[in-house]
């Protein structure tokens, strides 16, 4: 039985396009990208127009695929507001491969500069900018033939991509996302972070980033780190520090300056390292890998390595707590990115869609003055597809908690 045909995208399904008016001039600088290779001069879909169409896809659930995006481009109001003509499926597919995704970074930087910081814990006011670092896997369903070939070779029908994300805690938004195939070497999450380090940042990471060479790179870049390390880490105590009442109340059970990499000292940290032990609720993490029983039961103690030797122990624990903000963000971001359907399966196309999703996050924050949440994003989508009025959107925003500092 044939699948049910999707309804055509109609003019009344696409509203709220006036909000794209501010964005169009910002993207205009991209207009001539990749035009030099078009010797015949017959390009009809330009980079700025392609990005605006992707943003329309991200904000309008009615536009749910490449084909419906092509249909939307035929609407007179879409063409007027986005400054584009009718886009064929072929031109949309080509655009994902010829335009330079890195050029969207400057757009992201400019929009980020317009954001004001959200609420920050006053206890963290003396800590340099907090950046939570993590990666998430993005499963892209390839075309039927590609999937069949892949299954013959590896027994798998999925292609995995990893989003290496640096998330600015204070403003509640990603400052950088790098897209790589899932794997080691140059695509390893630690290698990607080492290539993109900045000064005056406190990087907050989980156990996947436990690597002494990376710790040294962070310090050499003029930044700091708070990294949860493995439970079985070996160390030699250099200094045992007393636990204050404030630290004990925060769950800190031990605070020591240590020497690491005892078997291979030359491969260890080249700076003073401190371990702060924080008691939490024990849990057991199961592994989904075949033949792997997982990391076993946890003793409920977080072991946090840091080069911040003069910061109170309870603040080290508080800094690590901020890492969970990136986990919450990923739930929202996967929904926003359209993980239900990737518009392109090429790395270039995925990067463009990812950067456009970051721009969408920034727009939600700029339009609403709030941290982008799933509920607010859904309300904006209802407005864009005509299910909610502007008054109802404003009423929703007025009910949100204040974000004043």
Kindly label every feature range from the protein language model:
Residues 42, 75-93:
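Short, basic interhelical loop/turn and adjoining N-cap
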Residues 1-68, 85, 96-99, 106-110, ...:
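Single, function-defining residue in the core of a domain
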Residues 149-151:
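Conserved mixed alpha/beta core segments that line enzyme active sites in large multi-domain catalysts
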Residues 113-120:
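A short, well-structured juxtamembrane/interface segment
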Residues 71:
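Alpha-helical residues within the helix-turn-helix
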């Amino acid at each position: 039985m044939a699948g049910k045909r999707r309804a055509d995208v109609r003019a009344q399904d696409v509203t709220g396009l006036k909000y794209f008016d501010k964005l169009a001039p910002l993207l205009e600088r991209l207009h001539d990208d990749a035009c030099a290779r078009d010797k015949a001069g017959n390009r009809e879909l330009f980079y700025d127009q392609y990005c605006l169409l992707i943003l329309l896809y991200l904000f309008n659930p009615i536009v749910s695929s490449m084909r419906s995006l092509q249909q939307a481009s035929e609407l007179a109001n879409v063409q007027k507001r986005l400054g584009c003509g009718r886009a064929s499926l072929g031109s949309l597919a080509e655009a994902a491969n010829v335009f330079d995704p890195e050029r969207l970074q400057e757009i992201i930087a400019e929009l980020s500069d317009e954001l004001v910081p959200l609420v920050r814990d006053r206890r963290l006011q003396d800590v340099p900018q907090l950046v939570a670092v993590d990666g998430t896997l993005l499963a892209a369903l390839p075309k039927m033939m590609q999937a069949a070939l892949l299954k013959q070779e590896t027994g798998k029908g999925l292609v995995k991509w990893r989003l290496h994300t640096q998330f600015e805690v204070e403003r509640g938004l990603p400052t950088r996302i790098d897209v790589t195939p899932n794997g080691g070497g140059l695509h390893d999450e630690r290698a990607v972070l080492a290539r993109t380090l900045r000064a005056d940042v406190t990087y907050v990471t989980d156990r996947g980033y436990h690597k002494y060479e990376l710790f040294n790179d962070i310090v050499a870049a003029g930044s700091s780190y708070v990294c949860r390390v493995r439970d079985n880490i070996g160390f030699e105590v250099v200094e045992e520090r007393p636990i204050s009442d404030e630290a004990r109340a925060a769950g800190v059970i031990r605070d020591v300056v240590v020497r690491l990499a005892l078997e291979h000292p030359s491969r260890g940290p080249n700076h003073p390292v401190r371990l702060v032990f924080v008691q939490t609720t024990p849990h057991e993490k199961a592994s989904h890998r075949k033949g792997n029983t997982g990391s076993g039961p946890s003793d409920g103690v977080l072991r946090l390595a840091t080069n911040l030797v003069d910061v109170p122990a309870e603040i080290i624990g508080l800094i690590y707590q901020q890492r969970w903000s990136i986990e919450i963000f990923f739930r929202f971001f996967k929904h926003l990115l359209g993980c239900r359907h990737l518009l392109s399966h090429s790395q270039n196309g995925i990067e463009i869609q990812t950067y456009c999703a970051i721009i969408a996050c920034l727009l939600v924050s700029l339009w609403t003055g709030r941290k982008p949440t799933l509920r607010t994003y859904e309300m904006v989508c209802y407005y864009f597809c005509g299910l909610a009025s502007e008054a109802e959107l404003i009423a929703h925003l007025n009910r949100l908690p204040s974000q004043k500092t």
